[in-house]
Design a protein with these regions (language model features):
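Low-complexity, acidic Ser/Thr/Pro/Gly-rich terminal tails and inter-domain linkers that flank the onset
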Residues: 33-52
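An extended acidic
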Residues: 1-36, 110-117
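Short acidic, glycine-rich loop/turn motifs
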Residues: 2, 39-41, 65
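Short small/polar-residue motifs
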Residues: 20-29, 43-47, 92-97
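Polysaccharide-binding surfaces and accessory modules of carbohydrate-active proteins
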Residues: 46-47, 51-119
Length: 119
């Protein structure tokens, strides 16, 4: 993996396709005590843990570098803000806006929506 290499670790299933194919780097998955995914890319080991905070409308995704070298990490959130019973159709017009508050990114998917916080 070169210094400027980009490796996408996500995997989304679409009709007749899975993109990107980050599952190819998945070396281990543990369900207990928390869902934990371990990825290995050219000797670099990255662990992702996902959990929800009891009693809160919050999901935490934590990344840990288990390797010996630093890994630059860029996040590209895949976000659809809709009720889970609703259908969502592709639209060229989105009203996403964000603001940085200290080390927190506050994202609104449309005017008046509840914000998504990324730290």
């Amino acid at each position: 993996m070169g210094r400027d290499s980009v490796v996408e670790l996500s995997a989304n299933q679409y009709p007749n396709a899975v993109h990107p194919q980050g599952y190819q780097y998945l070396t281990q998955f543990e369900q207990q005590p928390l869902p934990t995914f371990t990825y290995e890319i050219d000797g670099h080991i990255l662990q992702k843990t996902v959990f929800m905070v009891y009693g809160k409308n919050a999901t935490v995704i934590e990344y840990k570098n288990l390797g010996k070298k630093d890994i630059p990490l860029t996040m590209t959130p895949f976000l659809v803000d809709k009720d889970y019973h609703s259908l969502f159709h592709e639209s060229p017009v989105f009203d996403f806006y964000f603001e940085k508050v200290g080390d927190i990114l506050k994202i609104h998917s449309r005017y008046g929506s509840d914000p998504l916080y990324i730290k």
